[in-house]
Amino acid sequence: MKKFLVFITIFIATFLVLLVFRTDIQDLTLEWEKNGLPEETRIVSTGVPTKNPTALPAPSIVEFSEINLAVPFVPQAPYADWSLPYQEACEETSAILVNKFHKNESITSEIVKNEILKLVEWQKRKFGYYFHTTAEETAIMLRQYFGYKRVDVLRDITINDIKSHLLAGRPVIVPLAGQLVGNPYYRQPGPVYHMLVIKGFTKDGKFITNDVGTKRGQNYVYDANVLFNAIHDAPTGGDGWSVNNPEDYIKTGGKVIIVVYPTHN
């Protein structure tokens, strides 16, 4: 009986310790996983790494087993302020990060905060709202606000399509049913609709992202199939969805990605 009581006591104590330090353990696991990621790199528009000036064809997925583009990171709540408009600013922030990558410009929390506020006002004038911006509306923002000549909204894509753009030096913006990716750092149960940047992939095929929905989102790794299956565009843009179950409604959105080509007007 004493042995049983000792066992129960140890079990309860262990459970309580794990419960108290759960976030710390998650953080340690996250940092350990990030330490094994490929080094961040920049690729010029030809698909050739900048450290190699020779004009060679862009590497294929077979030739290039991993890549991690040097996309800068600041979360959509730059100063941990999750009030409006920041709690709804995943689309704006993803666009800002990709723009800074292509321009090779530095980034700070203050820059992102000010840019988000400008983009919110721009969208209100352009669309009449800034909530739930669709992939096409985000592409319009990238073309008209940021000045990119070519921004593609691609449908019926595959995982290899995404990898091909990454190898060519083009980060990929993806809209998501945010509750399907299982990120423990989201405010649970997670956003119904979300947007993030895919910036690379690992040798074992996982996607490396800058997930603006959490302060821990830099180089956040997702299982490729989990992330791919969660890709759903907003069925409609706007401040509110007049539906009973928005969690089901977002799943009716198409599987699309946004690809920005590094040229400006």
Feature names for model-found ranges:
Residues 125-160, 164-168:
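Mid-length scaffold segments of soluble, non-membrane domains
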